[in-house]
Design a protein with these regions (language model features):
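Hydrophobic anchor at the beta1->P-loop junction of P-loop NTPases
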Residues: 49-51
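Conserved glycine(s) of the Walker
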Residues: 58
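Conserved nucleotide-sensing/catalytic segment adjacent to the nucleotide-binding pocket
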Residues: 78-80, 87-138, 155
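Glycine-rich phosphate-binding loop used to anchor ATP phosphates in small-molecule kinases
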Residues: 45, 115-174, 221-238, 253
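Hydrophobic positions on the alpha1 helix immediately C-terminal to the Walker A/P-loop
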Residues: 61-66, 81
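Charged, amphipathic alpha-helical linker segments immediately N-terminal to NTP-binding catalytic cores
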Residues: 1-37
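Conserved NTP phosphate-binding and transfer environment spanning the P-loop NTPase/kinase superfamily
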Residues: 17-22, 29, 166-307
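Post-Walker A helix-loop "phosphate-sensing" segment adjacent to the P-loop in P-loop NTPases
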Residues: 68-78
């Protein structure tokens, strides 16, 4: 697990933002090429790629970028997000998280598991499926959105928090290369307080939910302990099944996301402590801003969270 200091990221942001952004992006890019090489080497025997990881790990963008790298190697990749198999709100009883007093939106019961299992079985058999699309703003599932079928020299990349769960995926695992994505780095404050990986992911999720899912930061904070519970229940038990791993953290992102959080939580810093995110509160006003827009590439994983 990599460790960065607050002093380091502030110094890089203040002294040479362009080089800081480029170095972070290049490190992530190198990881993707190593993973793509392994996928390509196994694609005839394993035409399925499963991408798993906790909330706000950058699964969607990493999926897309791996697909483009593989295309250059002559391997066409179909993309499927398990998020598109969520059921329409109001058509089922959402499981309740008694521990945190909120709906358990991470539960696999929120997904159309019968449809997903049917699609996975038919895909491996070479049949065509019609993938749905889930609208997070209206929480509505749109069926038969696009066709997917595996042909020669093609693979399917399936990303989602339940992608390693054998109860859901069945025998698909033997046809698959499994890739685990997450923020796997720690930020150390001036007093050696640890900002843990899940806290860095919270920053991503808070901004993404606000910008793209019509959910204010306060709501994301209230849900966060339940999200973490879901990760312990639905992701951590299967993490060891991964064939490959990617650390999607870009150190310069903290300089961007902390500025956003500071603006949104003026006078409400105690909410961070209530969500077990106290170290973020300690650095709210201690992270230097960064002039990143001229240097951040169009395919950066951060676009998934900040637009």
């Amino acid at each position: 697990m990599a460790e960065y200091t607050l002093k380091y990221i502030n110094h890089r942001a203040e002294c040479d933002a362009e080089a800081f952004v480029n170095d972070c992006e290049e490190h992530y890019h190198r990881q993707l090429h190593l993973v793509a090489d392994q996928i390509a080497a196994n694609c005839k025997r394993k035409p399925v790629v499963l991408l798993n990881g906790p909330s706000s790990s950058g699964k969607t963008t990493t999926n897309d970028r791996l697909g483009r790298i593989l295309e250059l190697a002559g391997i066409h990749a179909h993309m499927i997000s398990m998020d598109d198999y969520y059921r329409t709100s109001g058509t089922y009883d959402i499981p309740f998280d008694e521990e945190n007093g909120v709906n358990d939106l991470e539960s696999p019961e929120c997904m159309d598991l019968d449809l997903l299992r049917d699609h996975l079985t038919r895909l491996v058999a070479g049949e065509e499926i019609m993938v749905p699309r889930f609208d997070f703003e209206t929480r509505t599932s749109h069926r038969n959105d696009r066709a997917v079928q595996l042909h020669k020299d093609e693979i399917v990349m399936i990303e989602g928090i339940h992608a390693f769960n054998p109860v859901i995926m069945g025998d698909l695992e033997k046809h698959a290369t499994s890739v685990y994505l997450s923020v796997a780095s720690v930020l150390l404050t001036d007093h050696n307080v640890r900002v843990e990986p899940h806290m860095l992911r919270f920053l991503r999720r808070a901004m993404r939910d606000s910008l793209f899912r019509s959910s204010p930061v306060e709501h994301t904070l209230k849900q966060w302990n339940s999200v973490r519970r879901g990760e312990r229940l639905y992701i951590s038990p299967y993490r060891g099944q991964a064939d490959l791993t990617v650390d999607t953290y870009l150190p310069y992102e903290t300089n961007i996301l902390m500025q956003y959080l500071s603006e949104k939580l003026q006078g409400e810093e105690k909410m961070l402590e209530q969500a077990d995110l106290a170290p973020l509160s300690a650095i709210l006003d201690k992270v230097s801003p960064i002039d990143y827009k001229p240097y951040m590439p169009e395919d950066s994983v951060l676009h998934e969270f900040i637009g």
